[in-house]
């Protein structure tokens, strides 16, 4: 085996990526740890992999996420030091939201900086992730009392690239309600159509347009077609034979929240918003999905009791098919995240026909046009209130998000190139933005 895949937190998007690589990259072997006790994985996984990974002279490339302290592993296993070491950042700890600055554990961010210094290639899933990490290094290191190292960003930046997280969008046609099928016919060859634009960027900062041009507009099933948008804002209505039926008008708005049950996803804001809608006697249904871990914020049990009459689905759905069915039945997908560097769940929901509402912050402006972003909790509440009163506005809207830009079929070759040991440069010029 020439490619060694290591994942210290084998769950969620970390698991999705590793599974794709295992399926698609020849001559690879993987070693993982379960997605439990994240903090302990970050602290101790290097020691585990030191013992778990057998010596093998055929290894040429080592790929791992930034949960693992790569510097520790290389020190513990000098035989791995000569490999091409690729470090992938799903998230970074330098800007992880904490309630008070004193609560930030210096060690996690410090580990990631050390890992970057020993890696040969450092890859981020978004420009926001990369720039927020690199621009925070200097400030982060100033928390040291003295003898602070200098110029770490200058040493790390030349290694850095952006390679968006790849999603394998399944054909969900059979799960779509009639009004979604009529508006958005799905063909498998459309779902897997190559993206028209490059997906690799160097570490130079870049700007992103607020709205994709019409020729980039994709329908929610991923079909890349050149046509004028039938809807640009939630205030424009489009004629639709089925959506005009009384049944569609009377069915309550279905809101889905498909995120980890942790404080950094700000469930407090989401449930506070729903309770305001309830107090205003607005009609809606809600599905709260996403993974749960050891410590679940109290707001979930409190909200479940208060919103019991509105709940469609509650809790993690182990079956991916069942999860997709719920997304296909929903109308609006909401993010209230305070910590997000890509957002697989939001894009999967868009693929299933949901209208996205995201904060105008973090990675979201990089992926979603301005019409899907809100700046304040009041704006989020106002948008949902409008959709509750007129759910057909969300149901008739054609979402303008370039899903093919994030598909495995578009990005797979770039990952395969990344994992080639003999590539003098990581990518050819045609892959560089």
Swiss-Prot record:
GO cellular component, one term: nucleus
Pfam entry (one): Glycos_transf_1
Record's signal peptide: none
Chief location of this protein within or outside the cell: cytoplasm
Gene knockout outcome: Decreased postembryonic growth, characterized by shortened body length.
MF (Gene Ontology): tRNA-queuosine(34) beta-mannosyltransferase activity
Bias kind Polar residues: ranges: 221-239
Enzyme nomenclature, EC number: 2.4.1.110
A GO BP annotation: central nervous system development
Reaction catalysed by this enzyme: queuosine(34) in tRNA(Asp) + GDP-alpha-D-mannose = O-4''-alpha-D-mannosylqueuosine(34) in tRNA(Asp) + GDP + H(+)
Subcellular location: Cytoplasm; Nucleus
Top-rank EC class of the record's enzyme: transferase
Residue ranges of the region described as Disordered: 194-244
Domain of life: Eukaryota
Alphabetized UniProt keyword annotations: Cytoplasm, Glycosyltransferase, Nucleus, Transferase
PANTHER family (UniProt xref): GLYCOSYLTRANSFERASE-LIKE 1 (PTHR13615), GLYCOSYLTRANSFERASE-LIKE DOMAIN-CONTAINING PROTEIN 1 (PTHR13615:SF3)
Family statement: Belongs to the glycosyltransferase group 1 family. Glycosyltransferase 4 subfamily.
Its job: Glycosyltransferase that specifically catalyzes mannosylation of cytoplasmic tRNA(Asp) modified with queuosine at position 34 (queuosine(34)). Mannosylates the cyclopentene moiety of queuosine(34) in tRNA(Asp) to form mannosyl-queuosine(34). Mannosylation of queuosine(34) in tRNA(Asp) is required to slow-down elongation at cognate codons, GAC and GAU, thereby regulating protein translation.
Name under which the protein is recorded: tRNA-queuosine alpha-mannosyltransferase
Organism field: Danio rerio (Zebrafish)
Gene: gtdc1
